[in-house]
């Protein structure tokens, strides 16, 4: 089971660390796609679920909080094509509420923090949450001098020229304005303008856009401001950054002041005094959502009194005095035209619904994942049914069910294939459960012979966590796999590309989508990865159950590629002593060993591995020191470490043969405590466990 599927309260400390690393990477990727590339791949609900899981794990394992934790980060770094601008006042994001109870809890938290009576009225504003691109505009003496996107909340992109081209953004303020004023709000596009823009695109034979939000964001972030000027962008003002003299001491008063300066503000903003009033306004806006003419994805509540906002302050990446109450995912009905089968890297067959195109929340949906045969059976759907789909952003959404009264007489039941859809038509087998029964996952038994699996294996091989070959992504792998002149059918083929290209009459640089520079850069990037750490080599093989962390464990356990390779072959041949040696490694169990044995028992895999090993230089891993003063001991680090980070401390201890735990127990041998050590220090004293400080730790290990 991957750590992503394990409930938070069932995670071990090692699993929690791996999961936090995975979440930091995944959330960071989605932040970059959303904030920097205007191309989100998941819905708000899915993204929020990732952040909630990250926060829950951090609360359960506070000692594992990473320096790059998403809970400390807002947005994504500014991209390089725009000049970077540091916000004088950070552009923070908001915590989210998803249910009415969440809103009631938010209001109660505010009252408790302010030491108010449980039912005392507290004025809060409620306004629609615009689904657009956040922008900060700076005015000095009433004149627009700069504009920047949110970026990561600290540093954004300079889009001043583009902001001047937005009709709703005044170049000169009206009325009695402060000398310095940073106005913040959302750039968006109305539904009517979006549809008209797509009509023009079609008329000119150009590609149409996906939804108003991405189109607005992409339009503002053009290097050519004339393109921005040609797009019908609008702007709602709702907040501020640096202000030389506050025109009001309330949230509502500040927004009214922004309106007097010449900005468009939202007419649906109102004042409420209780959670009930907030929820009533939320549901009223939700009912009007479809008729507003622009996209919103929730309602934002803010404490109205700015002095109270100041008292409430901030928690990590968000203010205590505000929250965004998100709408539930949007739904729509459409026709299920067909069901196709996709094959993943491990051979898993996933059914995908092909739908009659339907617009859900501004996105044209044509596909939906069905997960497995059991899900199709559970839903009871047939080809030809009218199905209800729930939007999941701009990727494959979810089917919720079907309309029984609309089922046609010729609705066709889907029969899950017994053979792989690849040209080999290899048999499909079902996974086994821990109890020996049949699992829900069906797999192609063709392994590397299956072209679909080979492509997915190649994609893993060049991925960031494996060989990390720059310029060789999913599209390029697909290209080379199908290319008749420079075919790449195995990892080893990647390292012979330049040599084969030199011998070919038709060069890569002359092919569509390539050129002299891009081809040269690719060959150089490949050459740079001929020397590779052992753990990345092992991970890049794509063995089932051998993830990034397991690959590190195997690398440290065996030290060299030859030692690991020889052991794997021996295990595949039934050598029990080799199996016992691998089983003795920390966190390596039967599932991993069986997967390695299966992999290396396949002659085709062995040939691929040998060919790859002949092309690369695999670095030896630094093996744990067996005779160090802390070898074999379980160590806990707690408190603030001054000479090393927590990760450095853990890595150092593990290299010395120790096991690092996150909590103190009777199995703990040593606690290394820095300033601020709390409950763990107390627990160590209760259990009579040795406690030393950081300086003593370095003395003990002789560093």
From Swiss-Prot:
Zn(2+) binds at residues 420, 422, 444, 450. NAD(+) binds at residues 44-48, 93-94, 127, 150, 186, 302, 326. InterPro entries: BRCT_dom, BRCT_dom_sf, DisA/LigA_HHH, DNA_ligase, DNA_ligase_AS, DNA_ligase_CS, DNAligase_adenylation, DNAligase_N. One of its GO terms (biological process) is DNA replication. The keyword Magnesium applies. Belongs to the NAD-dependent DNA ligase family. LigA subfamily. Its EC number is 6.5.1.2. It is an enzyme of class 6 (ligase). This is DNA ligase. The lineage of its organism: Bacteria, Pseudomonadati, Pseudomonadota, Alphaproteobacteria, Hyphomicrobiales. Keywords: DNA damage, DNA repair, DNA replication, Ligase, Magnesium, Manganese, Metal-binding, NAD, Zinc. Its cofactor is Mg(2+); Mn(2+). The active site is at residue 129.
């Amino acid at each position: 089971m991957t750590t992503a599927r394990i409930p938070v309260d069932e995670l071990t400390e090692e699993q929690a660390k791996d999961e936090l690393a995975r979440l930091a990477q995944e959330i960071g990727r989605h932040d970059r796609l959303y904030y920097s590339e205007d191309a989100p791949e998941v819905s708000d609900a899915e993204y929020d679920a990732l952040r909630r899981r990250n926060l829950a794990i951090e609360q359960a394992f506070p000692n594992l909080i990473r320096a790059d934790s998403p809970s400390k980060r807002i947005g994504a770094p500014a991209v390089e094509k725009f000049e970077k601008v540091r916000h004088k006042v950070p552009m923070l994001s908001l915590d989210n509420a998803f249910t009415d109870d969440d809103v009631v809890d938010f209001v109660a938290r505010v009252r408790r923090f302010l030491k108010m009576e449980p039912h005392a009225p507290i004025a809060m504003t409620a306004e629609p949450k615009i689904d657009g691109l956040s922008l900060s505009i700076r005015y000095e003496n009433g004149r627009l001098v700069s504009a920047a996107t949110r970026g990561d909340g600290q540093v954004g992109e300079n889009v001043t020229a583009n902001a001047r081209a937005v009709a709703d953004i005044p170049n000169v303020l009206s009325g009695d304005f402060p000398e310095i004023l940073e106005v913040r709000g959302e750039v968006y596009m109305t539904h009517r303008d979006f549809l008209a823009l797509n009509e023009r695109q079609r008329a000119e034979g150009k590609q149409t856009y996906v939804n108003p939000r991405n189109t607005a964001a992409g339009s503002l972030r053009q290097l050519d401001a004339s393109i921005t000027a040609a797009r019908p962008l609008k702007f709602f003002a709702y907040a501020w950054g640096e202000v030389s003299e506050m025109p009001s001491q309330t949230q509502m008063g500040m927004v009214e002041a922004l309106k007097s300066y010449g900005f468009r503000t939202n007419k649906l903003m109102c004042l409420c005094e209780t959670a009930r009033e907030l929820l009533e306004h939320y549901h009223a806006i939700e009912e009007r959502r479809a008729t507003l003419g622009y996209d919103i994805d929730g309602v934002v509540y803010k404490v109205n009194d700015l002095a109270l906002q100041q008292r409430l302050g901030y928690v990590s990446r968000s203010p205590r005095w505000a929250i965004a109450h998100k709408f539930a995912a949007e739904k729509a009905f459409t026709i299920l035209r067909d069901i196709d089968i996709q094959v993943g890297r491990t051979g898993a067959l996933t059914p995908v619904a092909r739908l009659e195109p339907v617009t859900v929340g501004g996105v044209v949906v044509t596909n939906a994942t069905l997960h497995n045969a059991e899900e199709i059976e559970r839903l009871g759907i047939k080809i030809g049914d009218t199905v209800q789909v729930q939007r999941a952003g701009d990727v494959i959404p979810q089917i919720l069910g079907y309309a029984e009264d609309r089922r046609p007489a010729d609705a066709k039941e889907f029969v899950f294939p017994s053979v792989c859809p690849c040209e080999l038509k290899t048999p499909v087998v079902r996974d086994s459960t821990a109890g020996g029964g049949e699992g829900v996952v069906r797999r192609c038994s063709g392994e590397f012979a299956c072209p679909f699996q080979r492509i997915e294996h190649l994609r893993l091989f060049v991925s960031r966590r494996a060989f990390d070959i720059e310029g060789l992504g999913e599209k390029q792998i697909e290209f080379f796999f199908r290319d008749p002149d420079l075919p790449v059918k195995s990892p080893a083929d990647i390292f012979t590309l330049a040599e084969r290209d030199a011998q070919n009459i038709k060069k890569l640089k002359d092919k569509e989508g390539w050129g002299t520079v891009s081809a040269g850069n690719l060959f150089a990037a490949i050459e740079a990865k001929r020397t590779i750490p052992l753990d990345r080599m092992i991970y890049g093989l794509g063995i089932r159950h051998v993830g990034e962390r397991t690959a590190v464990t195997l690398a440290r356990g065996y030290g060299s590629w030859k030692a690991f390779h020889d052991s794997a072959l021996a295990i595949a041949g039934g050598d029990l002593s080799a199996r016992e040696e691998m089983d003795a490694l920390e966190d390596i169990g039967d599932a991993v060993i069986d997967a390695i044995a299966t992999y290396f028992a396949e002659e085709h895999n062995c040939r691929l591995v040998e060919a790859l090993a002949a092309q690369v230089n695999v670095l030896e891993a630094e093996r744990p020191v067996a005779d160090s003063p802390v070898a074999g001991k379980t160590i806990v680090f707690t408190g603030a470490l001054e000479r090393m980070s927590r990760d450095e401390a853990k890595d150092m201890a593990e290299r010395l043969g120790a096991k690092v735990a996150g909590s103190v127990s009777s199995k703990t041998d040593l606690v290394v405590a820095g300033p601020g050590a709390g409950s763990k220090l107390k627990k160590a004293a209760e259990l009579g466990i040795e406690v030393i400080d950081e300086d003593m730790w370095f003395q003990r290990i002789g560093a």
